[in-house]
Amino acid sequence: MSDRLTLLRPDDWHIHLRDGAVLPHTVADVARTFGRAIIMPNLVPPVRNAQQADAYRQRILAARPAGSRFEPLMVLYLTDQTTPEDIRTAKASGFVHAAKLYPAGATTNSDSGVTSIDKIFPALEAMAEVGMLLLVHGEVTRGEIDVFDREKVFIDEHLRRVVERFPTLKVVFEHITTGDAVQFVNEASANVAATITAHHLLYNRNHMLVGGIRPHFYCLPILKRNTHQVALLDAATSGSGKFFLGTDSAPHAQHAKENACGCAGCYTAYAAIELYAEAFEQRNALDKLEGFASLHGPAFYGLPANQDTITLVRDEWTAPTSLPFGELTVIPLRAGETLRWRLEEHA
């Protein structure tokens, strides 16, 4: 087994960078490894149009480390009021690559999200016409639905209908967490794909709940049982172009996580590819990591793969116990624990 692994530079097809004083920290972490990233638009207020997307993009570019060529790929936040013209203008910009469906109340800063999917059908029709991708947070939010069942119910009640109604629309089912989602994506047309996070590959709900509640494992969609984790590992390491890397790295300040009502999100960007390497190594599938991390995503988005490379070295190191987050701190996933792979830094 080799102690070095060289890959075409990967991309992150789902990340939260936040805004303001934290950007120099979050952008540096993602730019260290990834050539491009799909930037989530759930700011306050959200990124609803091309003008707001461009302003956010400029703030991200300004926060890049010196010499960085990292490219943010921008996303619109769909609301009940999103118009076909909003979509066409965003597509024409050249820097907006997708629009995101957040069911209202499903996750962090989703209060402005879609209250009924029927209300965005005109926008979805325009997206299909111009070739803009739909990114989906696939959970229902009704109070009577168990939090562990929200993804499956969303598939049955909404996602099947969208895919059937708009067969030419490219859809990314983001951060899938269940065997049900894997099956749906595998059985759907070539226009349907999914991202999978490192934390959903490495962990299940026992890690979060057994022996005490561990708030830094709390994310949405929530970690599921081990059988679903196994299904995700099967999908990620299958070699199928329908599955690719999306960290859903989502930082919150330490006090907002370690709280009686803590926020959802795991911060993984500081060591994302290293964490994925651990998951793939567990399956003796390191030969499949480059496809998942560097090739499948660009192919689905219709973009070229990166041409430069990164190298991972089998070399244990200890994750930091905390990281700067503006004037506050963020506790990364695996804080203070040993990681088995290290990204080789080039001078």
From Swiss-Prot:
Function comment: Catalyzes the reversible cyclization of carbamoyl aspartate to dihydroorotate.
HAMAP family on file: PyrC_classII
PROSITE patterns in UniProt: DIHYDROOROTASE_1, DIHYDROOROTASE_2
InterPro entries linked to this entry: Amidohydro-rel, DHOdimr, Dihydroorotase_CS, Metal_Hydrolase
Cellular component annotations (GO), alphabetically ordered: cytosol
Catalytic reactions of this protein: (S)-dihydroorotate + H2O = N-carbamoyl-L-aspartate + H(+)
Subunit and interaction comment: Homodimer.
Chain residues that bind Zn(2+) 2: 100, 137, 175
Molecular functions (GO terms): dihydroorotase activity; zinc ion binding
Chain sites annotated for binding substrate: 16-18, 42, 137, 220, 252, 264
The keyword Zinc belongs to this UniProt entry's keyword annotation: yes
Entry's family note: Belongs to the metallo-dependent hydrolases superfamily. DHOase family. Class II DHOase subfamily.
Record-listed E.C. numbers: 3.5.2.3
CC cofactor note: Binds 2 Zn(2+) ions per subunit.
The name this protein goes by in its record: Dihydroorotase
Entry keyword annotation includes Metal-binding: yes
Named cofactor requirement(s): Zn(2+)
One GO BP: 'de novo' UMP biosynthetic process
Any matching Pfam family: Amidohydro_1
SUPFAM superfamilies: Metallo-dependent hydrolases
Organism: Pseudomonas syringae pv. tomato (strain ATCC BAA-871 / DC3000)
UniProt keyword list: Hydrolase, Metal-binding, Pyrimidine biosynthesis, Zinc
Enzyme class: hydrolase
Modified residues (N6-carboxylysine): 100
